[in-house]
């Protein structure tokens, strides 16, 4: 992405509020009985920070519609682009469609 004006986003965030919402998905230890952990979706916000996303289950959808495992190393931070950032960047940054699948090994 090439944004020439380094202050491009300033007017969008000036006097804005901020929300930090921590979410923890604990390991599944029992048979999920057809439960869906998180169906395919894009996040509505600017970005989603995924700390500790080094376990299996998170998948992102590529431009061909295929699902790819998204696994970070333990010392890495994964960042999902949200719908708002996609819109504000005129879709130069794409909102990440992702899901969380339940793996048989998890329980």
Residue ranges of model-derived segments:
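Catalytic core of Fe(II)/2-oxoglutarate
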Residues: 8-9, 35, 50-107
């Amino acid at each position: 992405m090439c944004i020439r004006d380094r202050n491009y986003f300033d007017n969008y965030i000036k006097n804005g509020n901020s929300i930090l919402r921590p979410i923890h998905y604990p390991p599944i230890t029992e048979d999920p009985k057809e439960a869906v952990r998180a169906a395919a979706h894009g996040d509505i916000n600017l970005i989603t920070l995924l700390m500790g996303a080094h376990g299996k289950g998170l998948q992102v959808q590529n431009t061909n519609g295929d699902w790819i495992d998204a696994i970070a190393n333990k010392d890495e931070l994964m960042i999902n682009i949200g719908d708002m950032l996609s819109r504000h960047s005129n879709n130069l940054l794409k909102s990440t469609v992702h899901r969380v699948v339940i793996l048989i090994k998890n329980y």
